[in-house]
Amino acid sequence: MTDIVDELKWRGLVALSTDEDALRKAFADGPVTFYCGFDPTAPSLHLGNLVQILTMRRIQQAGNRPLGLVGGATGLIGDPKPNSERTLNSREVVAEWVERLRAQIAPLLDFEGPNAAIMVNNLDWTQGLSAIEFLRDVGKYFRVNKMIAKEAVSRRLNSDAGISYTEFSYQILQGMDFLELYRRYGCTLQTGGSDQWGNLTSGTDLIHRAEPDAVVHALGTPLITKADGTKFGKTESGTIWLDPEMTTPYAFYQFWLNADDRDVSKFLRIFSFKSHEEIEELEKQTEERPQARAAQRALAEELTTLVHGADQTAAVIAASKALFGQGELTELDEATLAAALSELPHVKVAEPAPVVDLFAEVALVASKSAARRTIKEGGAYVNNVKVAAEDAVPAKEDLLHGRWLVLRRGKKNLAAVEVTGG
């Protein structure tokens, strides 16, 4: 079996480690019980979180036991943001978000077998803790000079916003999580993003002080960057969430399908569970025939299936093909069609209007005269049917599910019209 540290490094998933050689030995002697934490600071996880979940999945598949921690306690506080204090959410909201995050993490881990995953909530060991117990049993192991030196804290201390004692103490709570999981489950490794390195090492430092004989580790994954300099996991429409109500499966699929050729190799290694040979073959195809987008299609299908399931993925692929004239729009169910069209430029009209008006209104062309030229040149389509006449007006019978028209200029320029009249 491939050494899991070598595997993670090949995939570009190792940025920082407390002691790589010691960690490698721990895995060799294994199994290792490890954890990664997720704070409920939003009602859904996002692609940055997905990196961590899939890293957990890889380490579990190598024979180790994952603990998925959802921070019912740390989520009530929040780790320090770079420039300002967080707005505290109510206990009720945080409790609801805890359950939503648990439901998103659980399908991606294996909860059966000898190394079955376990979900934990740090509220379980903090809510009954008195202030005196916290200060005597945990706080005494932390040194303020080291806490101040953590990047997240020092940055805030040097800003106009400053930092509250609440957020300053966040690293103590996260360190306490590692200690508690070490004592309860024999957990000896915490994984997380390299931007959380200060919090990760708070845990290892605490354990070294409280349990001097313990051997524990931290592993940090790198910040994912994109070749064009834009932030990973965001589009013009906003953050890519795992919750299908916040980011549709269609938009999720399209995010990966639209990956830059310069990024797709990195994304395959980080997110895909394909073998080295399969990934290298897709990399070769991208280099030789980039227009085929074979790597992007493979990545989009695999990840959409992982997060949203095979049925949703099949519907999304059918919608994607149909929108570009490679399938029947009439065969798409209303929910799938509506989700796909919501990602396109679109307008609402009371009644079907002349095609030239619709093309201009939705900005597929610059003007009505440009729309007429497009029709004359054979480049205008409504519901994948070429528009033959410059004065064409869609009939109500043409509306998909009684309300939608899909406009296309050429092969790739799409827009939607929603007809709202009865």
From Swiss-Prot:
GO terms for cellular component: cytosol. A motif ('KMSKS' region) lies at residues 231-235. It holds the Pfam family tRNA-synt_1b. ATP binds at residue 234. Its EC number is 6.1.1.1. Residues 353-419 form the S4 RNA-binding domain. GO terms for biological process: tyrosyl-tRNA aminoacylation. It is found in: Cytoplasm. It catalyses: tRNA(Tyr) + L-tyrosine + ATP = L-tyrosyl-tRNA(Tyr) + AMP + diphosphate + H(+). One of its GO terms (molecular function) is ATP binding. L-tyrosine binds at residues 35, 170, 174. A motif ('HIGH' region) lies at residues 40-49. Its main location: cytoplasm. Keywords: Aminoacyl-tRNA synthetase, ATP-binding, Cytoplasm, Ligase, Nucleotide-binding, Protein biosynthesis, RNA-binding. Belongs to the class-I aminoacyl-tRNA synthetase family. TyrS type 1 subfamily. Homodimer. Catalyzes the attachment of tyrosine to tRNA(Tyr) in a two-step reaction: tyrosine is first activated by ATP to form Tyr-AMP and then transferred to the acceptor end of tRNA(Tyr). NCBIfam families: tyrS (TIGR00234). This is Tyrosine--tRNA ligase. The lineage of its organism: Bacteria, Bacillati, Actinomycetota, Actinomycetes, Kitasatosporales.
